[in-house]
């Protein structure tokens, strides 16, 4: 749809948003800047969040807002001159799986990919990546410079989102009080402070594939995969065909459907990927990284790791990539990567 004019007031913008009109990139940027500067009242902010959710986000809006948030998050030291990958999902699939993308991060790192994992605690009953990693001994309060430097020494790091985006802290109570998912759930995966050149991003709804892929393309990534998993997962699933958007710089975004058998993996129902409470998810993640998990747990991590190897340019044949990931998992090498990161972040707190 046509964007609303840029000279109108916030109430006029809201009115046209409620009529289904998209924001222009400049208006989306202005809205995010106003939120960060606390220029809008809580009522206005809640109305805009609800209006954007009801209308549905488009790539231009997501990319513009993400660019503002990226600019509001300066690094505490120089960015390492490394090609990096992030692996994450938007959440919201309600499937209560174990922490698949977290396992993928350490598996990919064990295969030589530099992984900058951006994550948070759970916003619902599901155990978030930060929750499970903290439970396994990772220091979430490590100095930010140490977090950045860790990727150079270990090949993997974990950026705990609240430590990097303090400007969003004031919005957190309002978002919680709304009780529904908002644009910020979509922006989280787009605002990794280290700005990786490649990314695997999972979405729980098929209608988010194109907006998120378009946003990643506009943000200038070299390669990315946006995946909507069979059964509604926000990562590749073993339950059937998974719908992908393949993003490559300078090329049209491509659609691909990939099933587990395409990668030489066995199909499995979603129940085989279930997690549980924090203790359950810690145990499953440790077992996966040590190569002691169930075949389905190993296979789903291998599937998603194959996508990481593709975006990183390490292995462009997904079947071969999945085989490499499976071998690495069975050797228990990803567990060593987690231990390496634990040691790198073990000292110090705060900035």
From Swiss-Prot:
The keyword Metal-binding applies. One of its GO terms (molecular function) is magnesium ion binding. GO terms for biological process: L-tryptophan biosynthetic process. Its cofactor is Mg(2+). It holds the Pfam family Glycos_trans_3N. The keyword Glycosyltransferase applies. Its EC number is 2.4.2.18. Mg(2+) 2 binds at residues 234-235. Pathway: Amino-acid biosynthesis; L-tryptophan biosynthesis; L-tryptophan from chorismate: step 2/5. 5-phospho-alpha-D-ribose 1-diphosphate binds at residues 89, 92-93, 97, 99-102, 117-125, 129. Homodimer. Catalyzes the transfer of the phosphoribosyl group of 5-phosphorylribose-1-pyrophosphate (PRPP) to anthranilate to yield N-(5'-phosphoribosyl)-anthranilate (PRA). This is Anthranilate phosphoribosyltransferase. It comes from Synechococcus sp. (strain CC9902).
